[in-house]
Regions:
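Surface-exposed loop/interface segments of Gram-negative outer-membrane beta-barrel transport/assembly proteins
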Residues: 244-310, 352-359, 367-459, 477-597, ...
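Transmembrane beta-strand segments that form the barrel wall of outer-membrane beta-barrel proteins
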Residues: 347-348, 613-622, 665
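A conserved hydrophobic secondary-structure block that centers on an alpha-helix together
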Residues: 470-472
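Short glycine/threonine-rich loop-to-helix capping motif typified by GTGT followed
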Residues: 627-631
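Conserved small/polar residues in nucleotide/adenosyl-binding loops
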Residues: 1-8, 762-766
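Residues on the lipid-exposed face of transmembrane beta-strands in outer-membrane beta-barrel proteins
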Residues: 239, 251, 329-335, 368-372, ...
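Short, small/polar-rich motifs associated with maturation and membrane association
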Residues: 7-368, 373, 379-382, 461, ...
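Extended, hydrophobic alpha-helical segments in both membrane/secreted and soluble proteins
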Residues: 366, 597-603, 611-619, 632-641, ...
Length: 766
């Protein structure tokens, strides 16, 4: 027993010693943890690595937190941080640095960021270093577009690109923007050419969150590689691609309200009545007896007038706090051989005039981009595909003389918006008690009643490509792109009466139409880059073929069946009109098919990235012109000099980081006219043609001319053809410079250009 007791006692002591040792160790580790979590006041100086001068305004931030500061006039900073945290030092034009906190003093030297000049910009059928570009271009990054929270990329581009003017045509949700590059250069369509990932497309249907960058080719030298389509400039949109790494999921959304920034100040009832009385007095007549106009008063339950009706029609037409919202979900990632990027987007914008029921725009977007390298990168294949679906409803935009708001400016404030029964019509259509506004209309009622229309557009765009690089720097590429769109429009006009001049008492009407459009482009290029000592060359040759076709089908009906004369039932099948005279009509036809074939090339040279020369040439053939006039030639030449790289500029390098002067000349073309204007199509019609004998209404054949008798079928040219139609051309000469100053904090771009348009294409007045 004694031995057993001794062993138990020794075991107890051993365990106790182990427990005490473990406790002491735990306390030490805990104290170390507390020490490591101590907050330090970190100070230091930030200087330039090139000259040792202190940098003012450097951002110093604790990574992953909101804590931050900036350096003072001497480059000094002070910030609180914990040991082990990371400080991020950021400065415009300098490479960002991250340093882990290990003590109270951290001095940092930042180096200049050469990537600013080594950035690439998208040019025709390729990319190029920004400092080697010899034409006039402008770029906006996708991150800057996303910050704008707009429904259209064009809205985000407003005011961001010099030489590019973007204006809204009406401000209605989903309404297109008017874009001009370096002013109007033609009497016809002045819109630039839009290329989405190298293929023609509609920029208005792109989700802004999908955009990597937008580059605008402004001068003819930059755009001449696109020849016949580039007379009004070129807008190149590059969408986001996948990157090597683990799958990355992003989501962003916003929800906001929009209201008119300023509305027209209208006269209230008292001011309006005062002005009317002054008008009468100035004309020598007695002022109005306002008490005699029963229709302009509000009445109490006893039928006694209490106050004058006082309607602000502008305020009524507008809707405050119209909702706008957008949501985007993206997934991207990939491996060393395959990358992908997918996105889903939804945008909805309510109109500030009328509200959602009469002015609204909704869009759904889907996009997938992928790239795959095969055989150690010798072959690369991929695709960019997108689908968009748009639903919209809109009020009549019109012009400054005829639009939905015009009536609100003219309308008296003494008229009510609604009648006693809550409808828009009375008292405007009740002349027995509307003596003051017997000839007035209800602009709000007209807008809410007549805006029965819906437009739906589905668009699918895709291009697939294959690229082979059999030897280094020789790339042979083929791309096939398709743009298909299908649209459906429906409108309905009910019966209404707001005044003698604002009414429809005859028939209900419905209209439906459908459009289908198919645009196909096939592009083949071969490019090669090579160097000989300090001389760098790049060459590109290619051909492109394009084909467009489409169909249209439309119909209209009238006199909708009773019980089916409201918007939900307003379809062609519910109309009862039996003839064209009653409102029945239908038409369908194939759209004019067009084709274009192009051959192009480019040769570029630079010496030590100091002197640059580029040549381009394109030949376009278009079915819009007659034989002998179908082909046009569009050359360009441009040169640049990075003068800041010269030794004699050494003294300026303390403040001048980069200076390039450039000059260019080029010719571009325009074929934006209706197809086959060189032909004189023959049209047949049942009209008054009297040649020889013809059958009269009495069943007897007659000769000569008699207006009493019926008509006969005849044929005639619907227009005069112009067989000599040829290309409209635009020549531009450009001189400019690009500069970056003060550690790339200030960028200056200057251009002087002369633009001459020759052989204008326009339709003669009929």
């Amino acid at each position: 027993l004694g031995d057993v007791y001794k062993r138990q006692l020794m075991e107890h002591c051993r365990k106790s010693r182990f427990f005490r040792a473990a406790l002491v160790t735990l306390c030490l580790l805990t104290s170390v943890g507390f020490i490591s979590a101590d907050t330090l006041t970190v100070t230091g100086t930030v200087t330039s690595a090139s000259d040792g001068e202190p940098l003012i305004g450097v951002t110093v931030q604790v990574k992953g937190t909101a804590a931050g500061t900036s350096t003072d006039i001497d480059g000094n900073y002070s910030i609180k941080a914990e040991t082990g945290q990371t400080l991020v030092f950021s400065y415009v034009g300098m490479t960002q640095r991250e340093i882990t906190v290990t003590g109270p003093r951290i001095d940092v030297a930042l180096t200049e960021n050469s990537e600013v000049l080594d950035e690439v910009v998208v040019i025709g059928y390729g990319v190029q270093k920004k400092k080697l570009v010899t034409g006039a271009t402008a770029q906006i990054k996708g991150d800057d577009i996303a910050k704008m929270n707009t429904t259209s990329p064009l809205q985000a581009m407003q005011g961001q690109l010099p030489g590019v003017n973007i204006a809204s045509s009406s401000g209605q949700p989903g309404e297109g923007m008017k874009v001009t590059v370096r002013g109007l250069g033609t009497t016809g369509n002045s819109s630039p050419l839009y290329l989405i990932d190298g293929m023609p497309g509609d920029i208005n249907t792109i989700n802004p969150a999908d955009i990597e960058s937008i580059d605008v080719l402004k001068d003819a030298a930059s755009a001449a590689i696109y020849g016949a389509q580039a007379a009004n400039g070129v807008v190149l949109v590059t969408t986001k691609q996948g990157k090597e790494g683990r799958a990355k999921v992003t989501f962003d959304g916003y929800f906001g309200w929009q209201s008119a920034a300023k509305k027209m100040d209208m006269l209230n009832a008292y001011e309006y009545m005062t002005i009317q009385d002054e008008s009468m007095l100035n004309s020598g007549a007695a002022p109005y007896d306002w008490g005699s106009f029963k229709s302009i008063w509000n009445y109490n339950a006893d039928g006694q007038p209490t106050s004058v009706i006082d309607t602000d029609w502008i305020d009524t037409m507008f809707k405050d706090n119209a909702i706008t919202q957008s949501y985007n979900l993206g997934v991207s990632g990939g491996s060393a051989t395959s990358t992908y990027a997918l996105s889903l987007g939804y945008i909805d914008q309510e109109g500030i005039v009328g509200g959602k029921d009469v002015s609204n725009y909704s869009r759904y977007n889907f996009r997938i981009n992928s790239d795959h390298k095969l055989f150690d990168g010798i072959i690369t294949v991929g695709e960019q595909a997108s689908f968009s679906y748009v639903k919209s409803v809109g009020i009549g935009v019109g012009n400054q003389y005829n639009n939905s708001l015009r009536g609100a400016f003219d309308m008296t404030p003494l008229a009510p918006v609604y009648s006693d029964n809550g409808k828009f019509g009375s008292p405007f259509n009740d002349t027995s008690d509307s003596d003051w506004y017997a000839n007035e209309g209800n602009p709000y009622g007209a807008m809410m009643t007549n805006t029965n229309n819906r437009n739906k557009v589905a668009r699918f765009s895709a291009n697939v490509y294959a690229q082979v690089e059999p030897i280094k720097n020789l790339r042979i590429r083929t791309v096939y792109g398709v743009n298909y769109s299908s649209s459906e429009y429906r409108s309905f006009t009910p019966l209404y009466q707001f005044s003698p001049y604002s009414q429809n008492l005859s028939q209900t009407r419905v209209s439906q139409n459908m459009n289908h459009d198919l645009d196909m482009t096939w592009t083949n290029t071969a490019s090669y880059d090579w160097t000989i000592k300090d001389h760098a060359f790049n060459a590109l040759i290619g051909m492109e073929a394009n084909r467009y076709s489409g169909t249209y089908l439309g119909a209209n009906q009238a006199y909708l069946k009773e019980g089916f004369d409201t918007w939900p039932y307003a379809w062609i099948s519910n109309g009862t009109a039996a003839s064209a005279g009653d409102g029945l009509g239908a038409s369908g036809y194939p759209k004019d098919e067009t084709r274009r074939v192009s051959y192009f090339g480019r040769l570029g040279w630079n010496w030590a990235e100091k002197y640059m020369i580029n040549f381009t040439l394109r030949c376009d053939g278009s079915s819009n012109f007659a034989r002998g006039h179908r082909f046009g030639w569009f050359p360009s030449v441009s040169a640049g000099w990075n003068i800041s790289s010269e030794s004699f500029m050494e003294a300026t390098r303390g403040w001048l980081d980069f200076l390039k002067i450039r000059a260019s000349w080029g010719r571009v073309g325009n074929q934006n006219i209706s197809p086959y204007q060189f032909l004189a199509p023959i049209k047949t019609q049942n009209t008054h043609y009297f040649f020889g004998q013809y059958l009269g209404p009495n069943g007897v054949y007659n000769t000569g001319y008699d207006t009493v008798l019926g008509t006969n079928w005849g044929a005639y040219p619907s227009r005069l053809g112009n067989y000599d139609l040829s290309w409209e051309t635009s020549e531009q000469t450009d001189f400019g410079f690009d500069a970056r100053l003060f550690n790339n904090r200030l960028a200056v771009n200057f251009d002087f250009y002369m633009k001459n348009t020759n052989c204008l294409l326009y339709t003669s007045p009929s």
